[in-house]
Amino acid sequence: MKLTCMVIITVLFLTASQLITADYSRDQRQYRAVRLGDEMRNFKGARDCGGQGEGCYTQPCCPGLRCRGGGTGGGSCQP
């Protein structure tokens, strides 16, 4: 009898937790590893070029941007 009650309670708990997480992750990507891979790929330090407004003294500007400004502190990447 006690074992049956424990099994029923466990099944109800697992069902409730599945419903809660399914509702929470509806608008998110399915696989966490894919999401983390995209975040790592888009990480600011992972790029080999400077984005708009970033300094271009130590790295080249990304395609479509030019190094403008100069001076003692170096320029910045601008369109």
Curated annotation (Swiss-Prot):
UniProt note on tissues of expression: Expressed by the venom duct.
Family of this protein: Belongs to the conotoxin O1 superfamily.
Modified residues (4-hydroxyproline): 60, 63
Record carries keyword Repeat: no
Subcellular location per the Swiss-Prot or TrEMBL entry: Secreted
Source organism (scientific name): Conus virgo
Signal sequence, renumbered to the chain: 1-22
Protein known as: Conotoxin Vi6.9
Sorted UniProt keywords: Disulfide bond, Hydroxylation, Ion channel impairing toxin, Knottin, Secreted, Signal, Toxin
Keyword Protein transport: no
UniProt remark on domains: The presence of a 'disulfide through disulfide knot' structurally defines this protein as a knottin.
GO molecular function list: ion channel inhibitor activity; toxin activity
Annotated InterPro entries: Conotoxin (IPR004214)
Disulfide bonds: 49-62, 56-67, 61-77
Primary location group: secreted
Function statement: Ion channel inhibitor that inhibits the increase in intracellular calcium upon depolarization in DRG neurons. In vivo, both intraperitoneal and intracranial injections into mice induce hyperactivity.
Pfam annotation, one family: Conotoxin
GO cellular component terms given for this protein: extracellular region
Proregion residues excised on maturation: 23-47
